[in-house]
């Protein structure tokens, strides 16, 4: 089974990379208020760059949550099976 590498960075810290098989986070709406909301990323996802709004971030491995937290606004990128999240803040729950 393919896995993702999740990297979370804030201006104050960079968390150690985490191995997971899915990530859920909150996307910003576009200028007309469309398209935002919860978004899921799985292995094999296409290359992407996304604007994030404040909200929850969840990472799962084999269907079990392994990381739950609250993100500040920022960006997420997907390249290969690496998800990089750069946000104003991140607080584990």
Predicted segments, located by residue:
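Short structural boundary motif marking the start of a folded domain
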Residues: 2-6
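Compact, glycine-rich, soluble single-domain proteins
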Residues: 9-93
């Amino acid at each position: 089974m393919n896995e993702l590498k999740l990297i979370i960075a804030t201006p104050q810290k960079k968390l150690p990379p985490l191995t997971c098989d899915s990530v859920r986070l909150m996307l910003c709406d576009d200028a007309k208020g469309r398209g935002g909301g919860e978004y899921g990323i799985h292995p094999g996802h296409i290359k992407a760059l996304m604007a994030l709004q404040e909200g929850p971030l969840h990472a799962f491995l084999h269907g079990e949550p392994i990381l739950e937290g609250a993100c500040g606004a920022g960006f997420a990128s997907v390249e290969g099976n690496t998800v990089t999240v750069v946000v104003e803040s991140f607080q584990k729950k």
